[in-house]
Amino acid sequence: MAPIILAVGAGIILLLGTGHGVLTLLDTIRPRYFTPSDEGVRLAMEGVRTAMQHGKPVSSKGNLWRSWLGFNLSHSLGIVVLGGALLVFALHHFTAFAQSVLIQCSAVGITSAYLVISICFWFWVPTAGFGVALACIVMAAALA
């Protein structure tokens, strides 16, 4: 039962990361999801660089809006890697998960961090998702 519970939690994390990445990629074509509600703000973001971009940016498209999209894509990748790793443990290496306090604590700690960040900065969908995923991971670890 514990591997199934871990797989459910991992699947939720994978879904959150993949969904975030897809919506971000769609925003590169037509901004709708992670764009400011005031279009003027996005246009202003397109007109400036970040303070860290001293001199010439790597790309001619280097601006705050593109940096924002890149951050969102790299953020998605991290979440997908976490969910994917947990799914591999659930489906193929559950014994390693069950026997390793380090793996269990890492899974709980990283997912907890995403939950806290979500509560502080995001909206209800990722908060609910990370909350349920965390509960699944904790239950799987307790049952292991």
Sequence positions of predicted segments:
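Helix-coil boundary and interhelical linker segments in multi-pass alpha-helical membrane proteins
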Residues: 1-10, 88-99, 139-144
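N-terminal signal-anchor transmembrane alpha helix
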Residues: 1-38
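Residues within membrane-spanning alpha-helices of integral membrane proteins
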Residues: 3, 7-17, 76-79, 83, ...
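Membrane-water interface of alpha-helical transmembrane segments
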Residues: 3-10, 62-65, 69-72, 97-104, ...
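Juxtamembrane transmembrane-helix termini
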Residues: 23-36, 88, 92-99, 120, ...
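Core segments of alpha-helical transmembrane spans in multipass integral membrane proteins
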Residues: 37-88
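Hydrophobic, membrane-inserted alpha-helices
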Residues: 85, 107-117, 133-137
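Membrane-helix boundary connector in multi-pass membrane proteins
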Residues: 93-98, 111-129, 142-144
